[in-house]
């Protein structure tokens, strides 16, 4: 299995990025403090997964959902046909990661949904110096109870010094790893070069992902994310992810006119 290392810092994925990482649209590691944050804004056509590393994010949306996720918690939001929400920092230092997952054309106009998953609800396993938290999918005999519209795997691994792991992944799926902590991880082949933290490793075709922590003293933490490609055109315009430019223009019109999923646009404001 070949790998490609990407830096996480590109604000606007290109068409080739979408094809390479299908069904994933974007991955962003964030650090936000008051008075900053993400004030009221719309979305359509995808799902987002927010995973907290430190602090807390207060979430509100136009459907009456309100809550706060803290370290180890997950917010899984299906934007579907339309949602307006805010994401604001709770503490002075708030860090996490947000993944956008595309929806197939048949599901882009489904009803929006928001699920908060506390860290205590996320199943985990620990064996031979390898710990995994199973946010979506299955690993080390443990399966997540949470259903995802687009089939994906979202695993949070921590490897002790000199530990290794081998994770099965469906051969047709897109798979990549994001290194959260540790600079001596080796991916795919034991003789590959080490990859530093805050980089993305994109895996080639294969049915297994292998990872070694070559450090003598430091743990290696990484997220392994994989999903079934949708194979449809992707056109992204800011917070909207559709299949064509015509659909993007229709979405902008729906938002401006408060219709087809954006009925609350003219009246709703977060607290």
Curated annotation (Swiss-Prot):
PANTHER family to which the protein is assigned, alphabetical: BNAC08G48910D PROTEIN, PIRIN-RELATED
Subcellular location: Nucleus
InterPro entries cross-referenced by the UniProt entry: Pirin, Pirin_C_dom, Pirin_N_dom, RmlC-like_jellyroll, RmlC_Cupin_sf
GO cellular component, one term: nucleus
Cited Gene3D superfamilies: Jelly Rolls (2.60.120.10)
Keywords: Nucleus
Family note: Belongs to the pirin family.
Alphabetized Pfam families for the sequence: Pirin (PF02678), Pirin_C (PF05726)
Annotated protein name in UniProt: Putative pirin-like protein At3g59260
Main location: nucleus
Coiled coil: none
């Amino acid at each position: 299995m070949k790998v490609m290392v990407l830096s996480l810092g590109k604000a606007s994925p290109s068409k080739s990025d979408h094809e390479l990482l299908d069904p994933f649209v974007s991955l962003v590691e964030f650090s936000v403090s008051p008075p900053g944050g993400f004030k009221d804004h719309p979305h359509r056509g995808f799902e987002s997964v927010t995973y907290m590393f430190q602090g807390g994010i207060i979430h509100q949306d136009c459907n009456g959902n309100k809550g706060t996720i803290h370290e180890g918690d997950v917010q899984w939001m299906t934007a579907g046909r339309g949602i307006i929400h805010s994401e604001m920092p709770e503490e002075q230092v708030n860090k996490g990661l947000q993944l956008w997952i595309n929806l197939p054309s048949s599901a882009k106009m489904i009803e929006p949904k928001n699920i908060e998953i506390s860290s205590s609800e996320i199943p985990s396993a620990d064996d031979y110096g390898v710990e995994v938290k199973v946010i979506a999918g299955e690993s080390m005999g443990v399966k997540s109870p949470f259903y995802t519209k687009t089939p994906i795997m979202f695993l949070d691994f921590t490897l002790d010094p000199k530990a290794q792991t081998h994770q099965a992944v469906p051969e047709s799926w897109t798979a990549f790893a994001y290194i959260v902590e540790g600079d001596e991880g080796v991916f795919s082949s034991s003789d590959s070069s080490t990859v530093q933290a805050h980089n993305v490793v994109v895996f080639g075709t294969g049915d297994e992902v292998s990872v070694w922590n070559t450090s003598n003293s430091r743990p290696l933490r990484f997220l392994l994310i994989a999903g079934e490609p949708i194979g449809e055109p992707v056109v992204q315009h800011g917070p909207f992810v559709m299949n064509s430019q015509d659909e993007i223009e229709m979405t902008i019109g729906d938002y401006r006119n408060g219709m087809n999923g954006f009925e609350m646009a003219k009246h709703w404001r977060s607290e």
